[in-house]
Every structure is written in structure tokens, then in C-alpha cells.
């Protein structure tokens, strides 16, 4: 991991998904790339967002404090900022974007 490097990651979150897992990359209607992620937690009192942050931190092997929800707190489509990660780390963890 590279120190001082930040990556913006767009995620479409599915709460109550049965398990915590990434399901690959997709494009929205406007052609913007996002990562599909499901978590077992319900969308109640921030539980699904917390599970998403924990899942990303564990998968990318970074501290939870390095994952920040920048936008989309109550929406399914979220923008996160990942500190100390470069795009190659994301591609290794979740596969290359389509």
C-alpha cells in the first residue's frame, strides 16, 4: 500500500444481503462504474454502512479509520474515500473493473 494515496470508490450497497461479499463491477445508466457489495446487516441506524466500511477495510487490509463515507449515507449508491490505497490494490481485491 502506498502512504498518502487516496482512492474514491463508488459502491452500490445491498443491505440484508445474507452475507458480506463483493459481487463485481457494473455500470449505472449514465455509464459510471461502481462496485456491487452486499452485507448481512440491515439498513437501520447506520448498521449497513458500518458493515460496508468494516468489509472494505478487512478486504483491503487497511484500518477502518482509513475508509470514509463521503456521500450516500442513506442511499444505496455510496461514495467512499480510501486512504493509503491505490487503484491497483482495489483491482487486486475486487478484480479489474470491466
From Swiss-Prot:
Q: Gene3D superfamilies annotated for this entry?
A: YggU-like
Could you tell me which Pfam families the record lists for this protein? DUF167
Q: Which domain of life is it from?
A: Bacteria
Task: Cite the HAMAP family for this sequence.
Answer: UPF0235
What protein family does this chain belong to? Belongs to the UPF0235 family.
> What NCBIfam families has UniProt attached to this entry?
DUF167 family protein
Protein name as catalogued:
UPF0235 protein CCNA_03737
Native organism is Caulobacter vibrioides (strain NA1000 / CB15N)
